[in-house]
Amino acid sequence: GLLEALKKRNYEVKAGARFMRGDKICNFDFSKKFTEGWDWTWQVPRADFDKALTDELETWGVNIDFEKEVVGVDFNGSDSITTIKDVDGSLSAISAKFIVDSSGHGRVLPRLLDLDKPSDIGRHSSIFTHVKDTKRPQGREGTIITFDIVSLETWLWVIPFSNGYTSIGFVGPSDYIESFQGSHTEKLQEMMKLSEYYFDRFEGLEYEFEPVIIKNIAKSVKKLYGEGFVLTGNSAEFLDPVFSSGVTFATESSLVASKLIAKQLAGETVDWENEYAEYMKEGVNVFATYVKEWYTGNLQTIFFDSNDNPTIKAQICAVLAGYVWDKENPFVKNHHRLVKTVARIAEMEKEADKSIG
């Protein structure tokens, strides 16, 4: 498959993640998780990663058009004609038996077919850029992906890449991020002062591009499929960057959808509602619980204030690693209830420790 081409890029290995809040630290090691599976992934600069994939696919004979915009789609049953606009404004058309929308934040079909609907995740926005990480420490400290929580709903990500650059960005309530004055660069420079731990490391470094702001990052849709099309990855649902759930849904939805499309084009009957939509919603609902409970503070309580129970930590680690369909995991099967319950126990233990102290 594509794995060998990606291995040649020597991306930074992500074997876990670190969460910080003040002087408290919670480390997750993907090799110590409840569900069997991969113990690592990569920390990748997305542009390079995507280009590595498209370059490899072109060697397989896949036609990929760059610098084109989809401006219209007309369906006749499951057949469709897609209108494409070139950089010079000229139009062309593509006929297809089936469309897979993997356009991410571009959300092509949701926009054209009026499929967008409000997400029930809170209104958060992100602001981010890349820097040449010239003050990067040696060893694990310099390479570990870290989430620095500066307040209940606002946190900084630090994602080091193997090419010497690092992605830095904040997520927080939309109105809070909008409250910072000036250009996008000035906004992010001011926000970096919120991180006592990382401020010195990134102070004075030039941003590789004007920081990008994505407003109200959580997205949802009225339906995940229709006659002749399917939505995959972020073009369907996007919750929040905090647990890399977008990567999980992108890979899983694309894999499931591709198998179902192959069946359908071979003349077999496919139950898109149960085999795709309901299946994907199961995973979305699990991750949505963890995102919501992150911002209520319950999950943060488990991370930073609970007695370190290795069984519970392994079960939560499996969720963070993307294994959100494993019903053997109590933190998947009982996700609605269990996070609240364990957080409450942690708070009681904390109060008990205070009274003893």
Regions found by a protein language model. Give the residues of each.
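N-terminal FAD cofactor-binding segment of flavoenzymes
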Residues: G1-G22
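Hydrophobic "anchor" residues on beta-strands that sit immediately upstream
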Residues: E4, A93, K97, V230, ...
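FAD/FMN-dependent oxidoreductases across multiple families
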Residues: R9, Y176-L260, Q264-A277
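A short, glycine/Asx- and small/polar-enriched loop/turn
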Residues: V13-A15, G22-D23, D74-I81, Y225-E227
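Helix-loop-beta segment of a Rossmann-like dinucleotide-binding subdomain
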Residues: I25-V44, I81, V171-D175
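Short beta-strand to alpha-helix junction loop
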Residues: F34-E56, I177-S183
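Predominantly flavin-linked oxidoreductase catalytic cores and closely associated redox partners
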Residues: E56-F199
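C-terminal helical "tail/cap" subdomain of flavin- and related membrane-associated enzymes
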Residues: K259-G357
